[in-house]
């Protein structure tokens, strides 16, 4: 007999947990503190917001691999168009929310002499494994200081939890009116994955589920 597959909810932030994470990240950046000799600056804050508002994976192949030359600022100022060349699901072009435009502008200001071929995040680390590990340490420090290592569901929060929070929030705030096919394509995932790990784990009304076109 076929054993039913049980899908566990992905580790994600609640709205309050995400706001607390941002608040503590800002406060720590203002203190000039160092974590194992590495300054914790507003660049970590920008990283957090960018993951949420680009729906990208916080991995070497995705957000840590993005260079300035991969980004096109759309004329309306409402979105960035990002070419993700080495993503988990292959090459894709994604569009961001307006908040990502603001964060990208701030990143350019803290790296005013950047070249098109430079990475947008922590470009001083040419080895992107080093960049990833460094950011993970800084992120974990913020989680500890904010008492957010474990979320309200008892799950461990990690950088990847930002992506899960982003997708859940986008679905929830749309009240079921978002086109899940476009969202899945933009996030480099599939509709079935959205259904299994996000929509089926969320409290949605029957009308919202119908709007999401989930069969």
Report the location of each language-model feature.
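Short, basic (Lys/Arg/His-rich) helix/loop patches that form interaction surfaces
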Residues: 30-38, 111-117, 136-185, 191-192
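Conserved tyrosine-mediated DNA breakage-rejoining catalytic core shared by Y-recombinases
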Residues: 17, 26, 64-109
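Catalytic-site neighborhood detector that most strongly recognizes the C-terminal catalytic loop/helix
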Residues: 12, 86-89, 185-212
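The DNA-recognition helices of helix-turn-helix-type DNA-binding domains
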Residues: 70, 165, 174, 190, ...
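C-terminal catalytic core of Y-nucleophile DNA break-rejoin enzymes
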Residues: 7, 86-106, 117-141, 158
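C-terminal secondary-structure termini that scaffold catalytic or DNA-interacting sites
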Residues: 109, 113-116, 124-127, 207-215
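Basic, Lys/Arg- and aromatic-enriched nucleic-acid-binding interface segment
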Residues: 2-60
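Key DNA-contact positions within bacterial/archaeal DNA-binding proteins
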Residues: 61, 133, 192
């Amino acid at each position: 007999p076929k054993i039913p597959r049980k899908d566990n909810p992905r580790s994600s932030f609640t709205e309050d947990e995400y706001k607390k994470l941002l608040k503590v990240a800002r406060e720590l950046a203002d203190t000039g503190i160092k974590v194992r000799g590495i300054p914790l600056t507003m660049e970590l804050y920008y990283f957090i917001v960018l993951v949420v508002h680009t729906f990208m994976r916080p991995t070497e192949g995705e957000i840590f691999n993005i260079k300035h030359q991969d980004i096109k600022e759309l004329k309306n100022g409402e979105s960035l168009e990002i070419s993700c060349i080495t993503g988990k699901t292959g090459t894709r072009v994604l569009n961001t929310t307006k908040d990502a435009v603001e964060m990208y502008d701030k990143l350019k200001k803290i790296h005013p002499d950047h070249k098109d071929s430079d990475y947008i995040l922590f470009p001083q680390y040419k080895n992107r494994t080093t960049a990833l590990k460094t950011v993970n340490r800084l992120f974990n420090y913020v989680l500890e200081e904010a008492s957010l290592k474990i979320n309200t569901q008892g799950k461990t929060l990690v950088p990847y939890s930002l992506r899960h929070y982003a997708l859940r929030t986008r679905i929830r705030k749309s009240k079921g009116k978002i086109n899940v096919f476009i969202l899945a394509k933009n996030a480099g995932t599939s509709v079935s994955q959205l259904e299994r790990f996000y929509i089926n784990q969320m409290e949605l009304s029957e009308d919202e589920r119908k709007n999401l076109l989930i069969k």
